């Protein structure tokens, strides 16, 4: 199926609790994989405004992630530190590797990249820099503090 990204709705919402939502302001996702009817993995066309980030720094227990930079210069932050990615560069994040990652737009121009991830069940996302855990369920993500108490929605 051919997808014109201009026909895919913008998504600016986040599952994060209120105290973390401001960190992803300026992030716009288009679920182009869903628009194509994909079921086993997701593909998002993501735009980050200057100063925005892709997510809180995190890693997944069961789901692989991959990004491909299309436009702009973005900073990848991992356990190893910060690295600049430019158009054509890619990065992969294998499931189960305790190496939190996220992208930060520290430039003065928009960044556009593809974000690809599988949809393996029973995944957990760990956020090493924040008091947050996420566990996948049939109804979406369950967000808790690291001590297991639920965030109130």
What is each of the regions a protein language model found here?
Residues 37, 95-123:
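Ligand-binding loop in jelly-roll beta-barrel domains
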Residues 38-41, 54, 61-64, 69-71, ...:
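Short connector loops at helix/strand junctions that flank enzyme active sites
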Residues 50, 87, 118, 129:
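Active-site donor-binding loop signature of nucleotide-sugar glycosyltransferases
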């Amino acid at each position: 199926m051919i997808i014109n990204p201009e026909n895919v709705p913008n998504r600016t919402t986040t599952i994060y609790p209120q105290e973390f939502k401001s960190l992803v302001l300026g992030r716009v996702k288009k679920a182009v994989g869903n628009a194509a009817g994909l079921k086993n993995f997701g593909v998002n066309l993501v735009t980050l405004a200057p100063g925005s980030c892709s997510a809180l720094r995190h890693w997944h227990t069961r789901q692989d992630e991959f990004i491909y930079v299309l436009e702009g210069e973005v900073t990848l932050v991992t356990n190893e530190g910060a690295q600049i990615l430019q158009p054509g560069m890619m990065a992969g994040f294998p499931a189960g590797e305790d190496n939190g990652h996220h992208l930060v737009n520290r430039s003065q121009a928009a960044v556009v990249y593809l974000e690809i991830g599988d949809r393996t069940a029973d995944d957990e996302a760990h956020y090493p820099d924040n008091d947050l855990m996420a566990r996948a369920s049939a109804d979406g993500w369950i967000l808790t503090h690291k001590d297991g108490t639920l965030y109130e929605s």
